[in-house]
Amino acid sequence: MTRERHRCPKSNTTGAAGNQAPAEGRAKGRKAREMAITEDRVGSADLANGGSTTMKVRKRNGDLEPVDVNKIVRAVERCADGLAGVDPMRVATRTISGLCDGATTEELDELSIRTSAAFIVEEPNYSRLAARLLATVIDKEVRNQDIHSFSQSVAMGVDEGLIGSDVAEFVATNARKLNDTIEADRDHLFEFFGLRTVYDRYLLRHPEDRKVVETPQYFFLRVACGLSASPEEAIRFYRLISSLEYLPSSPTLFNSGTSHPQMSSCYLLDSPEDSLDGIYKRYADIAKLSKFAGGIGVAWHRIRSKGSLIRGTNGLSNGIVPWLKTLDSSVAAVNQGGRRKGAACVYLESWHSDIEDFLDLRENTGDPQRRTHNLNLANWVPDLFMERVEKDWQWSLFDPAKVPHLTDLYGPAFEAAYLKAEEEGNYERQVPARELYSRMMRSLAQTGNGWMTFKDASNLKCNQTGTEGRVVHLSNLCTEILEVTDQDETAVCNLGSVNLGTLVTDGAFNFERLAEVVRLAVPFLDRVIDINYYPTHEASKSNSAWRPVGMGLMGLQDVFFKLGLPFDSPEAREISARISEEIYFNALWASTELAQAAGSPHDNYALTRASKGDLQFDLWGVEPSDPSRWDGLKARIAEHGLRNSLLIAIAPTATIASIAGCCECIEPQVSNLFKRETLSGEFLQINRYLVRELQQRGLWNEAMANRVKMAEGSIQEVEDMPEDLKEVYRTAWEIPMRSLIDMAADRGAYIDQSQSLNLFMESPTIGKLSSMYLHAWKAGVKTTYYLRSRPATRINKTTIGGPIGGGESVEKPSFTDAEAVSCSLENPEACEACD
């Protein structure tokens, strides 16, 4: 039965311990507490007024009315129905105590929400209570604009220029069916911070008064309608995303169904040609792409290095830094649809002779004209460089004006061309490979930037590079997208992620439902390609010909919590690999169905490795779990082809994971204690899975909560914490990075693009980082993302002598950076410099 109007259900009040009281006792207790609160607040003389007080609130129409204490209590109780451990009276008491005479009803609503959120640190179900209270506020805000159905919300959006004409016509034609689809109770699936994120950032707002014109469920259905050709499709997709089992990426959520349907997440641009026209065209392209919420990756390999002769003027080049400084300012100036700052990552090949200046761009000291604090940086590293690091050989640095062909080569062809250029003496200078590698490690340790991405693995294991001349020149802003680019093609990708945490039922992971979710989602990812607004011709051309998409995942840590598995256990590693295999298999199957329905594969199918029978695991040399099943799929691919050249990419999912109420992508949790920030304030939250475990064992109380808070996120030293829980609830700082890398490599055989692989090191040293990234390269990982550290001080203490702070001094290091690299490579299991 459809429920358009959002109301919290009738209350079955629960006590602080979560036990349901008998109805009679509940009523008596409630009456007594109401009287106590009212008496304390306004005096016993007001009790005769039935809980009304001399304090007044201002209604939305401007009228003043007395505060009705009992009305506040009942409103909270309705929203607390079925929430064990939640005390509505406590919330009401705190709300009333913070109320000021003459406050507006909006302020009263916001105060009750903030009050509920403040208790989340003690009992996770207060998050659901705060979310339900917020949902009622959103509902009132929408209805006060005379919007009472989904179709009316869309009509309002059309009047204000927010909704696209095609979607407006689609909704008007199918209004009754679509209105009946709304399931308002699905708002109860949200945790508070997820719904707050939706309210603050995603719901469409009136352009003048900034009131929201859609509820969360209208929002989901609007997104679905923007990607659907029939009401049946829209209903199917609405039910999928409103269940939070799957969510499209932020650009799709922002823009689907709107007058500017730019729904792609990522744009990858080849290096500009080495000319003024080429560079300034690239600036313009990036600004256009960034304007509508696209994240940017751009290569800078072709731009000549510092000191290079400019024949047209007989002058010398200043190198890449001034150009990147201009790009830095441009990126910061472009606001992505008013929702977030523009963002870009610049990639540079390790043989470029400006590489050392490039690595300094994010430093906090030095000439500000040679620093770019808005750009992210990534190293595009060939295997030959890593091999020379291992062998402790020299590395030659080149001016791309002299060796322009190196940018478009990889694997054996690159190595041959590099060696030839080296033999001919075309290099600008030579440096010890380990010295340059240590500078890369230092950049990572000090800034978290200068990500290590591996050129040869990215090309040799990419489906799009099945024909000579097709080259991957870079990854994207978050290092999970790997697609070919050239001057005429800007690579594009549309993303979405399965919420794995919703797929654990009765103590087991539901692989059957995973398959269903993936097969439902892929057609809608593909649909974005045809509907999308493309800011540049090069982006439209590339996306239409290759039709790549990026199906990802989030909530892997939630799966392990629900199954009681340590993140790095053999069982967790096996489940992680199987999940990736199932997603890849079912995404490919769905793509063959799309090709069959369309009557043809994507335009460039003949250029791919899949057209020759090679899938991702073949390129890794890995045998899947059930080869006969894969043989059947390969036969389907041979018959129908694939509608999409690429299908799998694991994005960071920071924002949509917050909406879904799960942990980000493939990452372990970084803490058991979180500080959540919203537009209405900051709130503490303790890992809800940990709290539930402790409650079930009778160990959760105020003292335990305080011990967990005092431990600042780690529970390893918390008194009375069971040892098995310490294993399961370790943080990213307490899990060996070798395990994280090995799990990434396991799933990599089923990821035809890449994965945003953050690595964590509490106190990074050159030696530790050297060993870690060498292991990632040897494991076949294509890309890595941020290095996360806390605090970023150990690197300074181990490499810099002299006074620190208030005159203290530290012992001079026993190892130089180069010695630390050498030690870590030659003694990987027992490196003194890594201690």
What are these regions (language model features)?
Residues 169-197, 479-484, 525-530, 623-627, ...:
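Catalytic alpha/beta core of large soluble enzyme barrels
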Residues 360, 375-440, 444-447:
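Polar, glycine-rich mid-to-C-terminal structural blocks
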Residues 8, 24-49, 794-835:
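Acidic, low-complexity intrinsically disordered tails
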Residues 181-197, 201, 228-259, 287, ...:
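Conserved oxyanion/phosphate-binding beta-strand-loop segments in alpha/beta enzyme cores
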Residues 26-53, 86-221, 238:
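Core nucleic-acid recognition elements
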Residues 204, 218, 223-312, 316, ...:
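Function-dense linear segments that define catalytic or interfacial modules
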Residues 517-540, 548, 566-653, 709, ...:
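Internal maturation/activation junctions in enzymes
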Residues 127-158, 381, 458-486, 549, ...:
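Terminal amphipathic helices with adjacent charged low-complexity linkers/tails
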